[in-house]
Amino acid sequence: MPDNVLIHAIKADITSLTVDAIVNAANTSLLGGGGVDGAIHRAAGPKLLEACRELGGCLTGEAKITKGYRLPATFVIHTVGPVWHGGNHGEAELLASCYRNSLKLAIEHHCRTIAFPSISTGIYGYPVEQAAAIAITTVREMLADERGIEKVIFCCFSDRDLDVYQKALAAG
C-alpha cells in the first residue's frame, strides 16, 4: 500500500464527516431504514431518497453512488452488507465485496477521502471482530497499488467497535 494512504478508526457521527464519500450500510431497496442508513437519509434530506428510488435497489455485496445532498460529504456510496447466518453462507466474501465495490466507485469518481461505517454489524448481526478484520484486510489489498485514495476512515458507532477496529489496525 502506498505510504501516503492513511487508514484509521474514529468514533463519530458519519453524517458529520467532511470527506469526499461516506459509505452507507443500506438495505437492498436503498430507500432508508434504521441505524446508519436512516441517519444518512435524514441528514442528506429528501433528494437522497429520490436519487435512491431512481437506482432501483442494490444487490448484497454490490454498491451504488449518489450525491451527498445536504451532507458535508460530496458522495454517498450505498452498499448492502450480508446478514450474518453463522458464517458458512458466503458472508465473508459478500462483506469483502461491499468494501471492494465501494472503493471502486470512490476511485472512479476521483474521491481521495472515504469513510466507512462498520458494515453489517448492527441489525444484520455480523460479529464486529470478524467484520473489522475483513474490512481492514480488503481495504489494504484494494489500495496496495492505488494512488488515488489518500485517507480511509472507519467510523465507529460505539467505544467497543472503535477498540476492535483500532486493535485490528494495529495488528495488521
UniProtKB/Swiss-Prot annotation:
Superkingdom assignment: Bacteria
Gene3D superfamilies recorded: Leucine Aminopeptidase, subunit E, domain 1
SMART domains: A1pp
Residue runs in coiled coils: none
SUPFAM superfamilies listed in its UniProt record: Macro domain-like
Residue span(s) of domain Macro: 1-172
Family: Belongs to the MacroD-type family.
Name of this chain's protein: Macro domain-containing protein CT2219
